[in-house]
Amino acid sequence: MTENEQIFWNRVLELAQSQLKQATYEFFVHDARLLKVDKHIATIYLDQMKELFWEKNLKDVILTAGFEVYNAQISVDYVFEEDLMIEQNQTKINQKPKQQALNSLPTVTSDLNSKYSFENFIQGDENRWAVAASIAVANTPGTTYNPLFIWGGPGLGKTHLLNAIGNSVLLENPNARIKYITAENFINEFVIHIRLDTMDELKEKFRNLDLLLIDDIQSLAKKTLSGTQEEFFNTFNALHNNNKQIVLTSDRTPDHLNDLEDRLVTRFKWGLTVNITPPDFETRVAILTNKIQEYNFIFPQDTIEYLAGQFDSNVRDLEGALKDISLVANFKQIDTITVDIAAEAIRARKQDGPKMTVIPIEEIQAQVGKFYGVTVKEIKATKRTQNIVLARQVAMFLAREMTDNSLPKIGKEFGGRDHSTVLHAYNKIKNMISQDESLRIEIETIKNKIK
C-alpha cells in the first residue's frame, strides 16, 4: 500500500468511526480492507452482504477522504471473498493434498448451513470471547482448544458459531470431513443403527471426522437409552486421540449437565469453556441494523432503537419482530417503518412473551435525585453544576438501561433534550462504570431501589 493509499484509508476509517456506533463500526467496517487506489477508483475488499450498507452509509465518507487526500472524486469497486478465492482455488487444484486421501471412507454430508459465517455474526462484549475462541479453532482445528465448549441461553448465536467454524474450515480445506449435528439427531442415528444392526457404519462415520460440531449437548444428558452416552464417549475419545477438533454447545455449563456421566463432563472441560450472554442495547441495535438490510423498507433510527428496547433476551426475538413488521408493512403497503407501525406489528409477540415491569422515567429521575440530593426539576433543567450533571447523566443511563423507550422519547422526558445528548450521557456513564467501582456500586444501589 502506498503512503497516499494508507493516509486515504486511515481517513476513511476515522470518519466512519466518528459517524457510526461502535458495535456497528466493528461489524460493518472493521474487517474491510483497501486493496488499491488506481485511476480514482478505490478497490475495497469486504464481505458481500455488507456492500449495501457501505453504499447507503459510507459513500460520503469515501468522497470526503478522496478529496482530502487525492483532491479528486473517488469511486469504489467492491470485491468479495469469492473473487479473491478464484485464483487460490485454481492453484489448489494443481496441488497435491496435504493429507492422505480417504477414498475408502464413507461420504459424509456436513449438514452445515452456508448462511452462517464469522463475517455476519454481530460481535459485542457478551460474545467476544466465544467468537475469538471459535475463530482460533477454525484457524487451527485440533490444536488450540479441544474441545471448545460454548454455553448460553437459546437464540444467542451458538448454532451460528458452530456453523461458522465448519464453513471456515471447509473454505480452507474443501476435503475436510466435517459433521454438524444436534445431540438429539445423534441419538436418533444411534437408535436407527442399533435397530438395523449396522453400528459399524455409525462408528466409521463419526470416528473418522476431522471436525465434529455437536449442538445442544444437554439433550444427551436427558436420555437414558442404554449405550448412547457410551457410544458418544468412544466417539469423543477416538477423535480427540487423533487430534481432531470437537466443538459442543449447551444451554448450561458442563458441571450442570445433570444425568451425564462424569467421565464425559470431565472430557468436556479438557479444552476451553466460554459463555454467551444476551446482547446489550448497542449490540441489539447493530444486529437490527444488519438484519434490516434483508428487507425493502426504511427503518428510521428511532424505530431501530425502539425495537432494540423491546426485546432483550435473544436474537431470535429480534428476527421474529422484523418478520412481523414485514407482514404488516406489506399488507398496508408501507415503505417507512415508524415506531407506531413497529409497535402495532409486534404487539402480539410482546403479549406472548414474558411480561416486563414498566418503569416510568419519572420514577428513575426521582430515585436518582433522592440519592444525589437534587430535585427532578433540576435534573430536567439546564443547570450544569457537577452534582446535577452527574445525576442527570446517571438518570439518562438508567432510563436507557431499564426502560424500552427510544432515545428521542428519553430526551423529551429530560427537558426536551436531543437523542444525541442521551446517547452521550449513556456512553459516558458506561465508560465511567468500567473504571470507577464506587460509581458502579452507586448505580447498582439506585437500580435496586427502583426495582
Curated annotation (Swiss-Prot):
Chain sites annotated for binding ATP: 155, 157-159
InterPro entries: AAA+_ATPase, Chromosome_initiator_DnaA, Chromosome_initiator_DnaA-like, Chromosome_initiator_DnaA_CS, DnaA_C, DnaA_dom, P-loop_NTPase, Trp_repressor/repl_initiator
Region listing for Domain IV, binds dsDNA, in residue ranges: 330-451
Alphabetic keyword roster: ATP-binding, Cytoplasm, DNA replication, DNA-binding, Lipid-binding, Nucleotide-binding
Main location class: cytoplasm
Region ranges (Domain I, interacts with DnaA modulators): 1-77
A single GO cellular-component term on record: cytoplasm
SMART domains per UniProt: AAA, Bac_DnaA_C
Annotated region described as Domain II, given as residue ranges: 77-110
Domain of life according to the entry: Bacteria
MF-aspect GO terms: ATP binding; ATP hydrolysis activity; DNA replication origin binding; lipid binding
Positions of the UniProt region annotated as Domain III, AAA+ region: 111-329
CDD domains: AAA (cd00009), Bac_DnaA_C (cd06571)
GO biological process: one example: DNA replication initiation
Cell location: Cytoplasm
PROSITE patterns: DNAA
Domain note: Domain I is involved in oligomerization and binding regulators, domain II is flexibile and of varying length in different bacteria, domain III forms the AAA+ region, while domain IV binds dsDNA.
Family from the record: Belongs to the DnaA family.
Quaternary structure note: Oligomerizes as a right-handed, spiral filament on DNA at oriC.
HAMAP family in UniProt: DnaA_bact
Functional summary from the UniProt entry: Plays an essential role in the initiation and regulation of chromosomal replication. ATP-DnaA binds to the origin of replication (oriC) to initiate formation of the DNA replication initiation complex once per cell cycle. Binds the DnaA box (a 9 base pair repeat at the origin) and separates the double-stranded (ds)DNA. Forms a right-handed helical filament on oriC DNA; dsDNA binds to the exterior of the filament while single-stranded (ss)DNA is stabiized in the filament's interior. The half-life of ATP-DnaA is 12 minutes at 37 degrees Celsius, in E.coli the half-life is about 41 minutes.
Protein name: Chromosomal replication initiator protein DnaA
Organism: Streptococcus pyogenes serotype M1
Organism phylogeny: Bacteria, Bacillati, Bacillota, Bacilli, Lactobacillales
Annotated gene: dnaA
